[in-house]
A protein has these predicted regions:
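Feature marking well-ordered beta-strand scaffolds used for ligand recognition
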Residues: 1-176
């Protein structure tokens, strides 16, 4: 199956950007797809019959990124809006809900999200010289709480490196 940008309501001046996968508890597969105006949820269980389930509007932006934890998706953009929290609990029934936006004392611009699904921490980077921001999504996934910040300099990307040995030079269970 082939979906075009106009299928997502994106005009010729718009774009598609990042994507991420989600598998529902029933085993159905979904693509979370960023467009210049929204985060789309597309069922791809049968790739020959992909269908748009929902679109969550966001600020117009060249870049949008998304990640998941439990049955929640988190979406950000370089256009602002903080972290959009999207509930996918009923996605198989075609119900996708924007729970809210997480705003803190930073601008809402973000380039990249990384989620460590083992520790339950979300890392937000690449936004207007705001450094790297850390959020707890384990305690209350619907309302991530900022628990840390590293630097006020620009950080473009992040990755999670879990440590599995006590002989590590680091005194933390993970690094970014």
């Amino acid at each position: 199956s082939w979906l075009t940008l106009p299928d997502f309501g994106v005009n010729a001046a718009g774009n598609g950007n990042s994507c991420f996968g989600y598998t529902s508890p029933s085993g159905r597969e979904y693509a979370l797809f960023g467009t210049s105006t929204s985060t789309a949820v597309v069922e791809v269980t049968n790739p020959g019959d992909a269908r748009i389930v929902a679109q969550i509007p966001g600020p117009v932006s060249l870049w949008r990124d998304m990640r998941t934890y439990s049955h929640y998706a988190y979406a950000v953009s370089e256009g602002g809006s903080g972290i959009q929290v999207i509930d996918l609990a009923n996605v198989d029934a075609g119900v996708v809900t924007l729970v809210g936006n997480v705003h803190d004392d930073f601008f809402g611009q973000t380039h990249t999200l990384v989620v460590d699904t083992q520790s339950g921490y979300l890392y937000r980077s690449g936004g207007a010289g705001q450094g790297l921001r850390m959020y707890d999504v384990h305690t209350n996934p619907a309302q991530p709480a900022r628990v840390g910040t590293w630097s006020d300099r620009y950080v473009h990307e992040a990755t999670i490196v879990p440590f599995t040995t006590e002989r590590s030079l680091w005194h933390t269970p993970e690094a970014w």
